[in-house]
Amino acid sequence: FQISWKAKVARTFQNIRLFGGMTVLENLLVAQHNPLMIASGFTFLGVLGIGGYKAREAEAIEKAKFWLEKINLIDRADDPAADLPYGDQRRLEIARAMCTDPVLLCLDEPAAGLNPRESADLNELLLSIRKDIGTALLLIEHDMSVVMEISDHVVVLDYGTKIADGTPAQIQADPR
């Protein structure tokens, strides 16, 4: 796997960064702000439909709804993001990152603080992103069960030094 320096990269943080005062849907739409502004021509006339804004806005809403369905939050679209349980907030943050259509999604400790059910839901989502959507994932994770379940290649670091590199099966067979 190689990635160009021009590739679109998205990132989620260990500490969830949502706009708590915005709705769940608005959190997904804000990720698509730049394409919407470009479609508007950066003018008020663009918002009125001149310059393709309305068509782009409809596409943004469809993409947001796709991700809301994928993370099972379509029925909470109008709820404030701050009112969601922690596991739902984590999945919403990942969906927001995916609304930017990244080639590579970097996740810092995505399973931190999740209970077993939430962790299983997260693993299912990340596996779907990797296999169905085709987005490469870069996981920074201490929970090796998460890494082994969703990864096709693992690099183990010890204070920045690579100590193991291979498939999950190879890493499990030789856990240095």
Language-model features and meaning:
Residues 1-176:
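Glycine-rich phosphate-binding loops of nucleotide-dependent enzymes
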